[in-house]
Amino acid sequence: MRIKRYAVAAVTAAVLGTVTLATGISSLAATGWVQNGNNYMYYDNDGSLYKGWIQTDDGYYYMDLSTGIMCTGIKKINNALYFFDTDGLMLTGLIHDVSTDKYYYAQSDGTLVIGWLNLDGSYYHMENDGSLG
């Protein structure tokens, strides 16, 4: 009888330990912004990798549809160009890219102007890459 009680206690402890361990592991699932090397990704509350547009109090971010990696620099999305800063925030208005010393202009929806831009009565030609010609 004594051996059976110890065996039952050991099995019960092992089962409870497994349940506790499994619960502990599931609570460690990544949520929110997660850095992986030089890249950032965003995980939903259920732990799934988010892809597409994210709106925060700061503005808009775009997570690549194939990789889920936060976009920076110029990105073509649905045949329109957008400019994201080094923190991934979509920019609007006049943009100076210090790494290339080029200027861009993004409308209020974030799309870069291509072709002629009328800014306060002055006209500027924006190239096909969105940069000032």
Model feature map: region roles:
Residues R2-G133:
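Extracellular adhesion/carbohydrate-binding repeat motifs centered on closely spaced tryptophans
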